[in-house]
């Protein structure tokens, strides 16, 4: 999910639930304590959000998301033409949980 308004604090959070749990029971969902994807000034990625998942032609899991390449928003933050579609390969840990990293290429 996306959270924290529209500026550099905009980020992606994650909810998870055990595989055999009742997905309709909101008490069983677990919210990650920290964002799984956030601004990375070093790489010039600001306010990532609105993600979805797909596979590339080689069968690798890929996350598609948008982010800005500038820290400052000019004009209306809800109509900002500086958001760009970006891709990230998603890797998985031993427990089957996604590992999100700008280093995943």
Which residues does each PLM region occupy?
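Carbohydrate-active catalytic/glycan-binding domains of CAZyme proteins
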Residues: 1-105
